[in-house]
Amino acid sequence: MIMKDKIKGINTICTHVGEIKDEQFGGAVSPIYPSTSYEYIDAEISRYPRYSNTPNQEYLCKKIAALEETESAMILGSGMAAISTTLLSLLDSGDHILFQNDIYGGTRNLAEAQFDRYGIEYSFTDSLEVSDFEKEIRDNTKVIY
């Protein structure tokens, strides 16, 4: 059996998936790139930490995707960045999101301070019961948080 045909275990995935070969010095492990600025070699490709496309970030995304057995992964700088990125990618003007009342304050602030300007409707329920959530679902409910 050829090595690439074998099922990889978690240790192999954590160690080898997404490896960056050290072409310059021949290091046995992927180098760490401490830079925050990169030369614009091509106008179409701009590396920048906020774009999550530096070599270190790409390396980590490949590892996470392999561990989660998914096509790709995304890393973000904070939990709130993950929440807002997810919600704003799923919701459009005219959509509704239903929240449980006891949510993280940053998420509540996102809804109350930003969703109106985007035309996103939102409501809260005090209950934890599925049946109570079901009663609050509207025709335009797209997310239950």
Enumerate the predicted regions with their spans.
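Active-site phosphate-binding strand-loop segment of PLP-dependent enzymes
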Residues: L128-Y145
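Short helix-loop-beta connector
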Residues: L67-E71, L91-G94, D139
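Conserved N-terminal alpha-helix of the aminotransferase class I/II PLP-enzyme fold
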Residues: S37-S84, G106-A113
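Short acidic loop-to-helix transition motifs that present clustered carboxylates
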Residues: M80-I83, D126-D132
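Conserved PLP-anchoring active-site segment centered on the Schiff-base-forming lysine
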Residues: S89-T107, T125
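N-terminal "arm"/small-domain region of PLP-dependent enzymes with the aminotransferase-like
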Residues: I2-P55, K62-K63
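A glycine-rich helix N-cap at a beta->alpha junction
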Residues: A113-E129
